[in-house]
Every structure is written in structure tokens, then in C-alpha cells.
Amino acid sequence: MKDMFLYNDAVKKMRQFFQDEKGFTEVPAQSRQSILAACEDPSTISQYIFSGVNWPLPQTGQMWLERELLDNPKVDGVFCITTSYRNEPNPVEGRHDKIFPMFEFESHGDIDDMIKLESELLEYLGFGSSFKSVKYDEASQKYGVSELDYDEEEALCKDYSTCTFLTHFPLRTHPFWNMRHAGDGIYNKVDVIIHGMETIGSAERATDVYEMREQFHNISDGEYANLLFNHFGKKRVEDELEEYFKLEMFERFGGGIGVTRMVSAMKSAGLLLDK
């Protein structure tokens, strides 16, 4: 994110929506250390040493936000602004930055509540008020592919709406281990594709500790867990995981907004102007 003025304007509007309109609480997250902060994709993590102990550079503030909400269930919601480090082996110019700002949120409710909140955010930012949605399997059948990629994301915004909600992801897309399983291998995950790029990634969270534990160890045929074990040791990873499982779970959802992509989308829609 190179333009500080565009960054400031976009973040200011998102902060106003979540804090002033929705009553969410902004929380500090970046100062915390966590192995599960590498939860987006362990194959792209980078590490650092602090006080003689290795940690992953954070890819997301999700696990910290979840903890804040679960520890403080009376708040309407929480959000944070973090820096995401993704050591992508083959970054696509215009789509992937290895280091970029993230605006993340967590709140009470199910997938429908999540879609409603995200729709209200888009309307608040100026993208209009009419958005279409399509289930993942329906879209993959339409375009004749098993998994949707960049070309399909661009097609979605041409065929449906500038802001398209891609919903209900199947198991073959390797959903994160604590996403809510709706049954029959379908997970309550929603990506919001804006101007041809996934800009908001979100999901209803799981509440079944047994199912989450099984999913953590078995997702991607165990490769996900083994990558973390190899980097940080099985005991450290499982100790942190079990500490999370001790929290009292309730219905909730959360998401992350790539600020660079949101700025690009808002510029394309004429909602942000260069200064």
C-alpha cells in the first residue's frame, strides 16, 4: 500500500462504519504473538526470532479477534488493523503483495448476519445497495472448472454484479479448520468479489470443538498441521490450539478486508480520488 492518502481515506471510512455505525470496539492485535496467526496458509509463512523463540510473522489477526470476542461476549463486535505477511512464491502483479494491510472484524451471528453486515458496509462505502450472490458449486459448474481462479473472479463481476458474494464453499477448496460446516461437505464461507478480485474473505465460525480439532489435523490430508508442527514443534502448536478450545464458543462470524484491494476497488468505482 504505497499511497498513504488513499489508505487513510479508505481505512477512515471502514473504521467509521464499524466503530460509529455498528458500535464495534477496535482492539490492539499486532503486539500479540501467536503460532495460529499463520493460519491463512502455512506454506507462505516467514519467521522471526524474538527472545530466542521462533514465531511466524502474522498473516491475520483472526485468532486474536476471536479471543477478544469470546472473552467479551457482551460487545457488539471487534475489529483491528494489522499487517499481513504472505511469502507468496509466485505473486501476481496487481493481485498479490507479500506485505499488505488488513482490516479485520469479528461479531455475533450466522452466515446470513455476516452477509447483511458486509452488504451494509459496501453500501456505506458507496458501492450501491444491490448485490448478487452465487454458491461456489453453481459458479464452478457455470464456468466448467473445479476451483475458481482469477479469470472466474473477473467473470463473476461481469455476469452477476460489480460486488458479487461467492458463498458456501465445498471441502475441495480446503476451507479453514474453524469454519462452520453446514453439512454435506459445504462450509459457511463467503468471499466478496469486487471489480474482479476477492476483496473480503469471511466465514461463520465453528462452535463444535471436536469437529474443529479433527478438521485442524486432517485438512489437506494433514499437510496443514504438519507444516506448523515442522516449523514450531507439535507441542507448542497443540498447546495453543487447546488453549483456544477452552474458550466458551457461541455463534459468531468474522472476516478480513485486504486494504490494498479495497482501495483499488473504491478507485475503480470512483469512490476515492488521487490527491
Predicted regions and their residues:
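Short amphipathic alpha-helical segments
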Residues: 6-10, 110-117
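A translation/RNA-centric and nucleic-acid-associated enzymatic feature enriched
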Residues: 43-108, 134-275
